[in-house]
Amino acid sequence: MDIYSYNACVQQWADALFRFAYKCTGHEEDARDVVQGAFEVLWQKRGDVQQEKAKAFLFQVTYRQSVDNYRKKGKIVYKEAERTDLTHPQNPDLKKILDKALAQLDEQSRALVLLKDYEGYRYEEIAQITGLNESQVKVYLHRARKVLKAYLVNVENII
């Protein structure tokens, strides 16, 4: 990967990486640090990373650095960045309900749900990012969605 390809990766993936890191860390500064660290690792390994695989590589590094951040600080918080489709003015509490539902999941399940359902990644891409195989991703997502469904259909959790 040359400097032009690297710069293209920065322009193309910086925002998506920041959103993902922010959802994982819950803090803007931590998210910026994680994204910067991911791009530093890409720069250091630019000779080994192919342009086509840069996206998966960056998300994998971001995911791992978010986990490292969790270990250092002892807590990981998944937050949903402002999204007009989820935070419509008629449903201001929907974001809070969804955040509480996501908080019911373990760290790995939250990451999988965020990558698949919020960011729209394919199972194959999620497997590359997390180091799981596709079957594991599908099983863990299915289980996570069952937990979310059970939480969301409970009236006490919504009121």
Name every feature range the model reports, one short phrase each:
Residues 112-116:
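A short pre-motif secondary-structure segment
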Residues 9-28, 44-45, 102:
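Amphipathic, Lys/Arg- and hydrophobic-enriched alpha-helical face
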Residues 19, 33-40, 44, 52-64:
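Structural recognition of an alpha-helix C-terminal capping motif at a helix-to-coil junction
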Residues 60-80:
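Arg/Lys-rich amphipathic alpha helix in sigma70-family domain 2
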Residues 130-154:
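DNA-recognition helix of helix-turn-helix
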